[in-house]
Structures are given as C-alpha cells and as structure tokens.
C-alpha cells in the first residue's frame, strides 16, 4: 500500500507504515532524493519567517537544512544530536517524543550551539516548517 503525495510540485508514492492498529503513516524520506530535497528547501525558504538560526534534529531533516542553508547563503545551522559526542562540552539536553519512534528520545546540543541559539533573536525549526509544507500541499 502506498499514499501518493505532491509536495513542492513533486509527486511521490509513500509506502504506508503501521504506527498502531488504527494508524498508518506515509514514510516521507528525503535521504537520497535530491529533486525532492531541493524543491522542498526552495518552498520552505519562501515560507520561513525571518530568523537568525536554523535547527533540526539528527534526522531526515539534515539534507533539507543543508540545502536550505545553501540556497539562503547561510554559513551555519544547528543539528541536535541523538547521542552525546566526545567533542561536545557544556552539553544542553532535552527529552522529545516522535511519532516514528516508539520511546522517548533525548536530544543534545553542544554548549557553543546552545549559546549561538541564545544570542539569536529568532529561531526556525526546519522539521516544523516541513510538516506545514506537507499539510498545506
């Protein structure tokens, strides 16, 4: 079973994945899909409010945030990691729940990234924008 979707002018058939007995979701995967990634980034760039910082979790949002930063001429974006890394210091963490992950996850930011965010006047979450783009299409 598949669910046909049209996002940013690009059509794809998404395989349906069961979440529980009553709910299936279409697996929207950007990894490896250059056309879809570039088109979504272009549309999200148009939708994004004015911001100083872009952030995503260590997820399928990484190629998207990279492409958005490239198109916008931005030299930095932040990725909240799923595991602490040896190079991180003064780590900031928060617990999150995801529809595609059965249990609670913890995301981690290096202290320098957390400071960069604190200094910003506005931040945009790429994954929230992507959800809005998909729902509006």
Positions of PLM-derived features:
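Cationic, amphipathic, low-complexity alpha-helical segments enriched
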Residues: 121-137
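Short Gly/Thr/Asp-enriched flexible loops that form oxyanion-binding sites at enzyme active sites
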Residues: 64-73
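Short, glycine/charge-rich flexible loops or terminal/linker lids adjacent to PRPP-binding catalytic cores
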Residues: 75-122
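Structured loop/turn residues at beta-strand edges in well-structured enzyme cores
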Residues: 49, 72, 118
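Active-site-facing substrate-recognition patch
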Residues: 1-51
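Gly/Ser/Thr-rich loops at beta-strand to alpha-helix junctions
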Residues: 58-64, 134-136
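Beta-hairpin (beta-strand-turn-beta-strand) motif
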Residues: 59, 82-83, 127
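Short glycine-rich phosphate-binding loop at a beta-alpha junction
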Residues: 51-58
């Amino acid at each position: 079973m598949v669910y046909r979707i049209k996002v940013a002018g690009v059509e794809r058939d998404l395989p349906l994945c069961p979440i529980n007995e009553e709910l299936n979701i279409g697996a929207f995967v950007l990894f490896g899909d250059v056309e879809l990634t570039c088109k979504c980034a272009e549309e999200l760039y148009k939708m994004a409010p004015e911001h100083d910082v872009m952030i995503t979790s260590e997820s399928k949002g990484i190629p998207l945030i990279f492409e958005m930063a490239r198109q916008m001429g931005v030299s930095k974006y932040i990725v909240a990691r799923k595991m602490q890394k040896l190079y991180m210091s003064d780590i900031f963490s928060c617990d999150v729940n995801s529809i595609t992950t059965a249990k609670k996850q913890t995301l981690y930011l290096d202290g320098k990234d957390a400071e960069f965010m604190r200094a910003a006047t506005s931040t945009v979450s790429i994954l929230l924008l992507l959800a809005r783009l998909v729902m509006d299409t």
